């Protein structure tokens, strides 16, 4: 092996001791490496998915072209020319048209119960004043109209919360106090208190970019229903957390398809995955982004002796 590209979750770079062990082992194998973490995401290079990962790159010492300069003695962003390849995504701040297919099988439509849930939260979004933070029904103190009573309610457990959670929960409380007439009626009409706890949490971080949640990118996660602006997709994961979009043709909310997910990981359109959508989603959630890996491979290739890297085939390509 003459070159390599390792990828891992971003917080690996925060664990200094682990990082130093990895770097030491790679250098002991005769590699010139990126001793400082290179943290990048596809959305920095024209692919609309936020997926920050740390990359550790290296090239064998005897494969490195000594005519190239290493001012710091190791590989850096400047040597690899990473910043020269930065590119923005959609110019209008909406990436959906770049990724979404026009005709999608109905099997990707959201189940009616979950689609109904999104319409219920849309009603909430349209009517509540001051929706600038997550709203948690189960921590807002529904039916409690006295602040002191709320603060000392044992079921809510406000006094026992860590400070960060107190601040978050208090925002839900203030939102309820300022909108309790609408919220009480809304909760009763839609029987919100009996719903799954995940469905009782809502976060809309669209700013003024979405007139309705149909304009955004939605996820139903352990932390609740989350709607974000359509500039980038969230990171694909291996768990059941597939992004949801509004399909104007079908007039339904639906999941992003495996083919669309593959676009977010920069796979060629003709790449064939297995027949199981569940397995394909998991594979894509665990995958590295093809464009980033290829970009780093080309950067390493350009630093090497072509005869060494290609085994004498100087006209070869990556």
What are these regions (language model features)?
Residues 1-217:
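Class I S-adenosyl-L-methionine
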Residues 125-318:
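C-terminal target-recognition/interaction regions appended to catalytic cores
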């Amino acid at each position: 092996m003459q070159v390599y590209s390792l990828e891992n979750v971003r917080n690996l770079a925060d664990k200094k001791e682990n990082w130093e062990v990895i770097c030491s082992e790679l250098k002991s194998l005769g590699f010139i490496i990126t001793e400082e973490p290179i943290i990048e995401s596809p959305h920095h290079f024209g692919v609309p998915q936020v997926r920050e990962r740390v990359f550790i790159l290296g090239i064998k010492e005897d494969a490195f072209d000594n005519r190239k300069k290493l001012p710091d003695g190791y590989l850096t962003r400047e040597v690899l020319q990473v910043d020269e390849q930065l590119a923005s995504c959609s110019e209008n701040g909406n990436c959906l048209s770049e990724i979404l297919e026009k005709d999608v099988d109905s099997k990707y439509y959201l189940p009616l119960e979950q689609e109904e849930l999104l319409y219920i939260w849309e009603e909430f979004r349209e009517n509540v004043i001051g929706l600038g933070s997550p709203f948690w029904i189960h921590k807002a103190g529904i039916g409690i109209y006295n602040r002191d009573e709320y603060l000392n309610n044992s079921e809510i457990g406000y006094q026992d919360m860590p400070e960060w959670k107190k601040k978050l929960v208090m925002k839900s409380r203030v939102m309820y106090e300022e909108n309790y007439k609408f919220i009480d009626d809304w909760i009763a009409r839609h029987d919100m208190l009996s719903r799954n706890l995940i469905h009782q949490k809502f976060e809309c971080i669209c700013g003024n970019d979405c007139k309705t949640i149909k304009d955004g990118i939605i996820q139903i996660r352990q932390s609740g229903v989350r709607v974000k602006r359509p500039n980038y997709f969230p990171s694909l994961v291996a768990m059941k957390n597939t992004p949801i979009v509004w399909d104007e043709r079908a007039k339904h909310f639906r999941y992003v398809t495996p083919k669309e997910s593959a676009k977010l990981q920069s796979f060629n359109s003709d790449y064939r995955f297995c027949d199981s959508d569940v397995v394909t989603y998991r594979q894509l959630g665990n995958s590295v982004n093809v464009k980033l890996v290829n970009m780093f491979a080309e950067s390493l290739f350009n630093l090497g002796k072509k005869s060494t890297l290609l085994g004498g085939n100087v006209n070869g390509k990556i």
